Amino acid sequence: MQSPEKRIAIGKNRDGRLEAFYIKPDGVLRHNWQNRPNSIWKGEVSLGVSARQVAGGANADGRLEIFYLTPDGEVCHDWQLEPGGDWNGKESLGADGRALDVSSNADGRLELFWVGRDGALWHDRQLEPSGDRNG
């Protein structure tokens, strides 16, 4: 039986470079990105957190943002400080979940959906494109 957990997400940086986010068997969330669009890859780099599921999207301003579940189900996210740049670091969204995914609204705001431990569908969206979350 295949695991229902999503262990890979692919994003596109504003300059066209692909970036892959993935969870290896040891549970550590890693990423790798192209040096230039359509070129070779940089090499695997740990994001310094353990996860069991990952999803990602691009903010309206071009910064990538990832959402993930920790091994104990905490819903967290991390984002680039500038398009194609360094990452902020783990931030909890103060919720627990069993599954998650993210998509962009027509106006560019990212909206996160997750199935809570209670089995209910929850969501959280940005208040404005590339902005803070509704919470």
Language model feature labels by segment:
Residues 1-135:
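A structural motif
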